[in-house]
Design a protein with these regions (language model features):
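Positively charged, amphipathic and often flexible ligand-engagement surfaces
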Residues: 1-185
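Short, structured beta/alpha segment
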Residues: 141-256
Length: 256
């Protein structure tokens, strides 16, 4: 839309998987309702290809496809036909054989991304790359697995997803069930989600009680709390914990 409005062609880089682990972990820690990404790699691959197809069709976008996946590259080349008005991108030290073929033998535009900086700046980046490409499901890792055949490595991701009915990965539970069956995870709010943010803003704008409370109004409440402390302290840890759990549930329920 921006390209059409400004009558300019905008370079757009398509990537996948770089922050998958951290996004999963963040969503679990925050106790959000669901994950903002796919839990199966095949679904991510299908989504990447769908985006790539739309980018190839867009006249106001210069597509840059960042991938080390040979099947993804082959699919994009098939869709592109004779067009070469796009480029492929790889990380320094990875996908060299695949990109050597693209550049030397076929003459496609490619770009190599290399990290630059001190040890402190680069360590987090390198760890993310190790996690991404060291995963069992990554294309680079599968290439080194002698137990996998070419057919296994180049299996159609669409068929993979169809075979499981599009269901989520069974080993990645919803954030709410992270600690099941012992307890339910606390519920968080995704402030990056506009409907959620608007709901919070609306709740803040209309508090349940607009009447301010002064010190004298709190005195009877403190007195009641002190009277009940002796009885409360004699209750078992389990009973008190159950009360706190119930209070937390009520706070979540009536948060708005």
């Amino acid at each position: 839309a921006v390209g059409v409005k400004t009558k300019r062609r905008i370079a757009a880089r398509l990537v996948k998987g770089a922050y998958w682990d951290s996004e999963i972990k963040h969503t679990q820690e925050q106790g959000l309702s669901d994950y903002p990404l796919f839990t199966r790699k095949a679904a991510t691959d299908v989504s990447y290809l769908a985006c790539a197809r739309d980018m190839l069709r867009a006249k106001n976008i210069y597509p840059a496809f960042a991938t080390h996946n040979a099947l993804t590259v082959a699919t994009i080349l098939e869709w592109a036909g004779d067009s070469r008005d796009f480029e492929f991108q790889r990380l320094h030290g990875m996908g060299e054989g695949l990109y050597e073929t693209l550049v030397r033998e076929q003459g496609y535009h490619t770009r190599i991304y290399a990290p630059v900086g001190g040890h402190r700046d680069l360590l987090a980046y390198l760890v993310r790359r190790l996690l991404e490409n060291g995963a069992n499901s990554s294309f680079v890792h599968q290439l080194a697995d002698e137990k996998l055949t070419d057919a296994d490595i180049l299996a159609d991701p669409v068929r993979k997803i169809a075979a499981v009915g599009g269901t989520r990965h069974p080993g990645i539970t919803l954030p709410a069930d992270l600690f099941a069956p012992e307890r339910r995870n606390s519920e968080g709010i995704d402030l990056n989600d506009r409907p959620e943010l608007e709901r919070v803003a609306e709740a803040v704008a209309r508090p349940l009680d607009l009447r301010p409370k002064d010190g004298p109004a709190a005195d009877p409440l403190v007195t009641r709390a002190l009277k009940g402390f002796d009885t409360w302290s004699k209750r078992s840890v389990e009973a008190r914990a159950a009360c706190l759990d119930r209070l937390a549930d009520l706070l979540e329920r009536d948060r708005d």
